UniProtKB/Swiss-Prot annotation:
It comes from the Bacteria. This is Spermidine/putrescine import ATP-binding protein PotA. InterPro entries: AAA+_ATPase (IPR003593), ABC_SmlMolc_Importer (IPR050093), ABC_transporter-like_ATP-bd (IPR003439), ABC_transporter-like_CS (IPR017871), Mo/tungstate-bd_C_term_dom (IPR008995), NA-bd_OB-fold (IPR012340), P-loop_NTPase (IPR027417), PotA-like (IPR005893). It comes from Clostridium acetobutylicum (strain ATCC 824 / DSM 792 / JCM 1419 / IAM 19013 / LMG 5710 / NBRC 13948 / NRRL B-527 / VKM B-1787 / 2291 / W). It is found in: Cell membrane. Belongs to the ABC transporter superfamily. Spermidine/putrescine importer (TC 3.A.1.11.1) family. Its EC number is 7.6.2.11. PANTHER family: SPERMIDINE/PUTRESCINE IMPORT ATP-BINDING PROTEIN POTA, SPERMIDINE_PUTRESCINE IMPORT ATP-BINDING PROTEIN POTA. It is an enzyme of class 7 (translocase). Transmembrane segments: none annotated. Part of the ABC transporter complex PotABCD involved in spermidine/putrescine import. Responsible for energy coupling to the transport system. The complex is composed of two ATP-binding proteins (PotA), two transmembrane proteins (PotB and PotC) and a solute-binding protein (PotD). PROSITE patterns: ABC_TRANSPORTER_1 (PS00211), ABC_TRANSPORTER_2 (PS50893), POTA (PS51305). Residues 7-237 form the ABC transporter domain.
Length: 352
C-alpha cells in the first residue's frame, strides 16, 4: 500500500440473503482526504460505511487499514469514529461530559481530559457551552457536540453518515463549510455519506457515485459534474440535457439533426453516443444566430436564474439563464464545443 493511502477496499461485497447490496467494490482513501459516498437510497453507501466502521462484515473481499486487514477487528479496536444522523448524545450528561466520555473510558488524567475537551469545544465553536444540557441546544449545536465527541479521541478516520440531514437548509449550508474547515484544520481523513449532490460537490476532495451496489464513477467534484461517465451520473448530479447523438469523427458530433464541433476524440466513426449539455452552458441568441432554434414553452424564475424550457424539433431543452424570455417566444440556442460532453452508451442499469 502506498504511504499516503490510509484505507483500501479490495473486491468488497456484501449480501443480504441472495441479494448483493455492494458488489466488488474497489477504492482507496488517502490520508487527510475528504471523500464522499454519494447516491440514492438503497445504493449501498451506508452499508459500505458500516463495513469500514466494523458494524458489518464483508462477505467477500478485504478492507485494509494501514496495511492490515480489519475485516474481523471489532469497532472499538479500530482507529475510526462515526457521527450518525441521529447524534446519540447522552441527555443525562452536559456538553462537557458528552465530549469527555471517550477519554474517561480510556481513564486519562483529569487535567488531560480537560485540556482535550476545551480544545475540541473551541474548534467547533462551543466554548462556554460546557455546562449546558444537550437538550437545550439547537440542532446545529448538537451536531457540533457529536463531532467534538468523535474527534476528541483523535481517530485517524472519521465517518459521517448523513449528519446534516436533520438540519434546515440555511444551517445545512453553514455546516457544510464548517465541516470542511474542521477537516482541513485537523488533517484527519473524513468519509461522508449523503444523497445530496450539493453537499458532495461543496465539501469533497473525491466523490464516489454509487447506484445499486456498484461504483458508477470516482473523481473530483469538477470531474463528476463536468465529465459524467454515464447517463446515471449525469442525471443524478444536477440537471442535464441528455440526447442521443452520433460521433461522426474526432471533434464532430451530430444531435438534434445538427452537426456540432466538440472536443472529444477516441470514438469510432458514426458511433452512437449520449450527449450531455448542462442547462447553464446553453447561450440564448437571436433565432437567426442560433445553431438550434425553438419555441419557449415555460419560463420559471428560480431566484438566481430563470429555468426555461424550449421545444426544438422533437427535443425539450432545459436552459438556466438570467435573461428573461416569454412563453411563446422563438429563440436561438448556441453551445460552445467545450460545453458538449460525449459519453459512450453503456449497458447498465441506470434507474435509481
Amino acid at each position: 500500500m502506498e504511504k499516503d493511502i490510509l484505507i483500501e477496499l479490495k473486491n468488497v461485497s456484501k449480501k443480504y440473503g441472495e441479494n448483493y447490496v455492494i458488489k466488488n467494490l474497489n477504492l482507496f482513501v488517502r490520508r487527510n482526504e475528504f471523500l464522499t459516498f454519494l447516491g440514492p437510497s438503497g445504493c449501498g453507501k451506508t452499508t459500505t460505511l458500516n463495513m469500514i466502521a466494523g458494524f458489518e462484515t464483508p462477505d467477500e473481499g478485504n478492507i485494509i487499514f494501514e496495511d492490515s486487514s480489519i475485516n474481523i477487528v471489532p469497532p472499538h479496536k479500530r482507529q475510526i469514529n462515526t457521527v450518525f444522523q441521529k447524534y446519540a448524545l447522552f441527555s443525562h450528561m452536559n456538553v462537557y461530559e458528552n465530549v469527555a466520555f471517550g477519554l474517561r473510558i480510556k481513564k486519562l488524567p483529569e487535567k488531560q481530559i480537560r485540556e482535550e475537551v476545551e480544545k475540541m469545544l473551541s474548534l467547533v465553536d462551543l466554548k462556554g457551552f460546557e455546562k449546558r444540557s444537550t437538550d437545550s441546544l439547537s440542532g446545529g449545536q448538537q451536531q457540533r457536540v457529536a463531532i467534538a465527541r468523535a474527534l476528541v479521541n483523535k481517530p485517524k478516520l472519521l465517518l459521517l453518515d448523513e449528519p446534516l440531514g436533520a438540519l434546515d437548509l440555511k444551517l445545512r449550508k453553514e455546516m457544510q463549510l464548517e465541516l470542511k474547515n474542521i477537516q482541513q484544520k485537523l488533517g484527519i481523513t473524513f468519509i461522508f455519506v449523503t444523497h445530496d449532490q450539493e453537499e458532495a460537490l461543496t465539501m469533497s476532495d473525491t466523490i464516489v457515485v454509487l447506484n445499486k451496489g456498484t461504483v458508477q464513477q470516482i473523481g473530483t467534484p469538477e470531474d463528476i459534474y463536468n465529465e459524467p461517465k454515464n447517463k446515471f451520473v449525469a442525471n443524478f448530479i444536477g440537471v442535464s440535457n441528455i440526447l442521443n447523438g452520433v460521433m461522426l469523427h474526432d471533434y464532430k458530433v451530430k444531435f438534434d439533426d445538427e452537426t456540432f464541433d466538440c472536443v472529444d476524440t477516441g470514438f469510432n466513426e458514426n458511433e452512437d453516443v449520449d450527449v450531455v449539455v448542462r442547462p447553464e452552458d446553453i447561450k440564448i441568441v437571436s433565432k437567426e444566430n442560433g445553431k438550434l432554434f425553438g419555441k419557449v414553452i415555460s419560463a420559471v424564475f428560480r431566484g438566481v436564474h430563470y429555468e426555461i424550457k424550449v421545444e426544438v424539433k422533437n427535443t425539450t431543452w432545459i436552459i438556466h439563464n438570467t435573461k428573461h424570455v416569454r412563453v411563446g417566444d422563438s429563440i436561438g440556442l448556441d453551445i460552445l464545443p467545450d460545453d458538449i460532453h460525449i459519453m459512450r452508451k453503456e449497458k447498465i442499469d441506470e434507474e435509481a
